[in-house]
Amino acid sequence: MTSSAETISVIIPFYGEPAPVLDLIASLRAQRGVTPENLEIIVSDDRSPIPFPDTEGVSIVRRERNGGFGSAVNSGAARARGDWLIILNSDLELGENFISSMLTALAAYPQALASPQVVGPDGKHQWVARKFPTVGHIAWEWFTPLARFKPTRLGHRGAGHDISACTAVRPHGTDWVMGACMMVPRTVYERVQGMDERFNINSEEVDFQRRLADIGVPRILVPQVTVTHEGGASSPSARRRQWLTTARFIYAEKWGFEKNLRRALTLTSYANYGFNLVRSLRNHRVNPREILNHELELIRRGTRHEN
């Protein structure tokens, strides 16, 4: 059972359908070793078209405008009173010992940000631990001929996945962990003033953890605790690709490599054009010019921070 020094505030950003969040709340209430007095559940409703229903024992923050993941987390954190913050995506499945196991693992890392191992519904790794993004990592993902290597060790390394951390059997430090499930002391969160709200969706957790790194806060993957993330299995739509591209340009501008990123992605788009010209000789449905124009538009909108 948690002690009075281990109070927990769970923050769940919400936008969309309430049902998955209600299921998640039920799993939180069923956690072993955690008393209701030590567990605060906060739902941050990010101006959802379907408002989150009033729920007994749940604190609901109703935002006046939609601001995205980082803004919703900040609003929830402002309401939180626990010693630890646990930030959860709504589409997670948690084991009944999730909180107690994370607390046990983090006893040796009292000032760290941590994530459990995150897997998809198929049980496969979602490569939760990653290296801070570089121009090379982003260009690698942009270059069409390399898509065939995505599931390989080479592909994971090229995209910046931290293979050593993701395959470790004990807690392992890394640059950053994806934001589906993060646990961090509230005082640590407040030291860097939380998430940068310029990021609407994507990269906010990367920037947050880079600022934590600057003040010496460890970022840890706890592989002996596993959660299942439904959303990670979905394929990116064209709109999601724009969100990701724009977020990466905001991040690159903030951390000093926006011009290099723009040049690299533009050159890579023209390299893709050459590759697609060859593809179009065998497959007349491939339109190299259309693909090039689409990629250049993604870059143009990204540099203007447009979603």
What positions do the PLM features span?
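Short, well-formed alpha-helical segments that are part of the catalytic scaffolds
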Residues: 17-31
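Short, flexible, basic/aromatic active-site loop/helix in glycosyltransferases
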Residues: 133-174
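A short, conserved alpha-helix in the catalytic core of glycosyltransferases
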Residues: 166-194, 198-226
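Non-catalytic, C-terminal membrane-associated alpha-helical segments of glycosyltransferases
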Residues: 239-249, 253-307
